[in-house]
Amino acid sequence: MWPLSHRHLCLAFLLVCVLSAISFFLHVHQDSFRHGLGLSLLCPDRGLVTHPVAIFCLPGTPMSPNTSSPCPQHPASLSGTWTIYPDGRFGNQMGQYATLLALAQLNGRRAFILPAMHAALAPVFRITLPVLAPEVDGHTPWRELRLHDWMSEEYADLEDPFLKLSGFPCSWTFFHHLREQIRSEFTLHDHLREEAQSVLRRLRLGRPWDRPRTFVGVHVRRGDYLQVMPQRWKGVVGNSAYLREAMDWFRARHEAPVFVVTSNGMEWCRENIDTSKGDVMFAGDGQEASPWKDFALLTQCNHTIMTIGTFGFWAAYLAGGDTVYLANFTLPDSEFLKIFKPEAAFLPEWVGINADLSPLWTLAEP
C-alpha cells in the first residue's frame, strides 16, 4: 500500500505545480495588458511601429475629387524626434508642416515643429503638433535631410531617430492620403472663418436681395515673382488673358459665379482684370505681412482659380471644389523643372490652362 500512496502524492504534487504555473502566467498576462505592457516594452529595440507603406505611393492615393483614405491610426509606439526647418513664406511653411506630419507618421516617429513655424501657423490654424523647445533642439544629435518636392520611395523607410528635414516640399504626393487629417490641422480659427464668411455674405449681384450661388476664389501671385520667374526660372506669371479664360471656364459650368479676387498686386488686378460682366469682386487686402485674411477668404469659396505659388495651392486644396491653375509656365529648358514636377504639384482632377510664353521668347531675342 505504501508505494501506491507515494505515487499518488507525487502525482498530486506535480498537478498542483502545473496548476500554479498556469495561474501565475494568466495573472501576469492579464496584468500586463491592464497596464499597457505590449511588444514595444518587452522588446524595446523593436518598437511596435505600423508603416502604412501601401498608401504613400500614387496608386494608393485617392484620385477622385475631394476624397481621402481613412486617416491612418497613430502607431502603437512612436519613437525618436523629427522636425523641419521653417523656411519661406506662409504657403511654404504649410507645405513643410504637412510633409513633416505625413512622413513622421509613415515612419513611426514623433513630429515636433520649431517655434518659428508655430508663430507663423498657430495664429491662423488649429494645428496640433507640439513645439520643440530650443534647448532640446540645441542638444539633439540631428541628422539632416533635404527633401525634394515630391514623394520618393526612400522617404517611406527612413531609420533615423533624430531627423531634421529641410527644403520646400508642397506636393500632394506626400500627404494626400491624409487629406482629412491635413484639412483638420489647417482648420481656421473661428474668428477668421466668420470674418471671411461675413465678407462673402455682403457680396451681391444685380438686385440687392440676390445672393450669388457660387463663389470662385481667385489668387493672383505677383510681387517678387515678376522678376524671379522670367529672370531666374525662364517662366511667367498669370496674365489677364489667362484669368479671362479661367473665369470663362467657370462661367460655362456654374450658374452666376462670383469671382473673389485676392492678390499681392491688387492695383494690377483692378487695372487688368475684365469686370464688364459685373461678376468680379476685388476683396483682397494684398497685405503680405498678414496674409491670413486673404487666405481665409479664399478657403471659404466654393472653387479656386490660382496662378502659381504655394499660397494658391493651399487655398485650392482646402477650399475643395473645382480648381483651375496656370500650366506650363516655364520654357522646356528651365532649371525650375529640375526641382518642380507639375504632375506632383497639381492634383490630377485640377484643370490646367497653358500659359502664354511669348514674353519669354521676346526676352530671348538678341
Curated annotation (Swiss-Prot):
Family per record: Belongs to the glycosyltransferase 11 family.
Topology, Lumenal side: 26-366
GO cellular component terms given for this protein: Golgi cisterna membrane
Membrane topology: Single-pass type II membrane protein
Single GO biological process annotation from the record: positive regulation of sprouting angiogenesis
Residue numbers on the Cytoplasmic membrane side: 1-8
TM spans (from-to): 9-25
Organism: Alouatta caraya
UniProt protein name: Galactoside alpha-(1,2)-fucosyltransferase 1
An example Gene Ontology molecular-function term: alpha-(1,2)-fucosyltransferase activity
Cell compartment(s), UniProt: Golgi apparatus, Golgi stack membrane
Main localization category: Golgi
Pfam families reported in the protein's UniProt record: Glyco_transf_11 (PF01531)
Pathway: Protein modification; protein glycosylation
CDD domains: Fut1_Fut2_like
